């Protein structure tokens, strides 16, 4: 009961602050003259599927960084159901999304989820190595800028990558711990068949005993959820806000050919600069 109350306070506080930040951003955009971006809906949907969800541009740029970025993005999409479920379990311990029970579509989903978690952790390690050790030109620029930027801490990028890895790892620890301390729960044990990464995580946890696994699982649940909420609130303050806005930006993007000028509008409200004949 106490845990649910604390979780509710945390959830409302973090979500409330995020809503406040979002409102401030949207209130600024609301002052900009409107442009109709609800036209050509089929074309906008296609663009979103190809470039937003499909991440096509990242396969056309620098490699392997582009592919790695795409997998991190896809990992977040796949983890959306896991994050929602773990949030709900703060109030309803046995909650799962419709059709995502372990004996329904949840089993195959767990396999894909665990696979993406491991892939994303590997991608994060690769990206951290770029920031810390290799300093590629795309990140640091050419000399002398390269030498100057290489000396910067770049703490924001490293912090975000750490957040991402923490979300992935704590998800596996949470599920793996449950497999150890709930040996009589048929649904939890059935997850072993599908959630292969969590099952592997359960091995070292089991070696420490069920009490340790229980404590580790609970700690992982709190850390996972608090990092997600902290990440959510950090993004609007950072240059990585596009993590949230990327799909809307693609959907509402300008569809006219690059370089085409907007048609001039001449009416009584149009401001005229210079001499008008």
Regions found by a protein language model. Name each.
Residues 1-277:
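Membrane-embedded alpha-helical bundles of multi-pass integral membrane proteins
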């Amino acid at each position: 009961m106490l845990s649910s109350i604390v979780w509710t306070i945390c959830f409302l506080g973090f979500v409330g602050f995020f809503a406040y930040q979002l409102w401030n951003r949207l209130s600024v955009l609301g002052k900009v003259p409107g442009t109709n971006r609800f036209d050509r809906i089929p074309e906008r949907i296609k663009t979103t599927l190809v470039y937003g969800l499909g991440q096509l541009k990242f396969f056309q740029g620098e490699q392997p960084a582009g592919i790695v970025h795409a997998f991190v993005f896809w990992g977040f999409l796949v983890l959306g159901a896991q994050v929602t479920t773990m949030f709900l379990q703060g109030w309803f311990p046995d909650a799962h999304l419709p059709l995502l029970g372990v004996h329904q579509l949840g089993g195959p989903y767990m396999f894909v989820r665990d696979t993406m978690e491991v892939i994303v952790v590997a991608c994060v390690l690769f990206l951290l190595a770029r920031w810390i050790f290799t300093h590629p030109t795309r990140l640091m620029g050419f000399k002398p800028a390269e030498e100057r930027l290489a000396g910067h801490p770049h703490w924001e990028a490293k912090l975000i990558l750490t957040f991402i890895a923490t979300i992935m790892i704590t998800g596996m620890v949470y599920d793996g711990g449950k497999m150890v301390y709930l040996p009589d729960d048929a649904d939890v044990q059935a997850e072993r068949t599908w959630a292969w990464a969590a099952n592997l995580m359960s091995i070292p946890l089991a070696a420490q005993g069920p009490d340790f696994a229980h404590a580790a699982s609970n700690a992982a649940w709190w850390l996972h959820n608090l990092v997600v909420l902290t990440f959510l609130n950090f993004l609007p303050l950072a240059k990585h806000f596009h993590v949230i806005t990327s799909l809307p930006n693609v959907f509402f993007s300008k569809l006219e050919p690059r370089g085409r000028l907007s048609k001039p509008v001449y009416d009584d409200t149009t401001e005229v600069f210079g001499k008008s004949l």
